[in-house]
Amino acid sequence: METLTFNFPAAEPGRGRTLVGCVSSGDLEVLIEPGTAGSLQIQVVTSVNGSAARWAQLFQRLFEGRAWPAVNIDIHDFGATPGVVRLRLEQGFEEIAHD
């Protein structure tokens, strides 16, 4: 098991919180909750050791160059593909946009 932490600039805090996916479905669950203004923080707990570079590249593609709400994201991963990660994050952000 490996725990990874990432930070990106963000706008104002998001209002809602949500849980999408589960570790046994697509091998990934994502919890999104309001964070501190100006900061999007991500913590990944993964069963795949040595995957920090893959996660960093995925998050850079998603979060750099766009104003996201300030949230804390907790990801519990058991070997999900980048496509599943992106899908779950998009689902989560869509959910909090409706709260």
Swiss-Prot record:
Highest taxon, organism lineage: Bacteria
Pfam families: ACP (PF06857)
Modified residues (O-(phosphoribosyl dephospho-coenzyme A)serine): S25
GO molecular function: acyl carrier activity
Major location category of this protein: cytoplasm
UniProt entry keywords in alphabetical sequence: Cytoplasm, Phosphoprotein
Entry's localization field: Cytoplasm
InterPro entries named among the record's database cross-references: Mal_deCO2ase/Cit_lyase_ACP, Malonate_deCO2ase_dsu
Gene Ontology cellular-component annotations: cytoplasm
Post-translational modification note: Covalently binds the prosthetic group of malonate decarboxylase.
Family to which the UniProt record says this protein belongs: Belongs to the MdcC family.
NCBIfam families hit by this protein: malonate_delta, PRK01220.1
Function noted in UniProt: Subunit of malonate decarboxylase, it is an acyl carrier protein to which acetyl and malonyl thioester residues are bound via a 2'-(5''-phosphoribosyl)-3'-dephospho-CoA prosthetic group and turn over during the catalytic mechanism.
Name assigned to this protein: Malonate decarboxylase acyl carrier protein
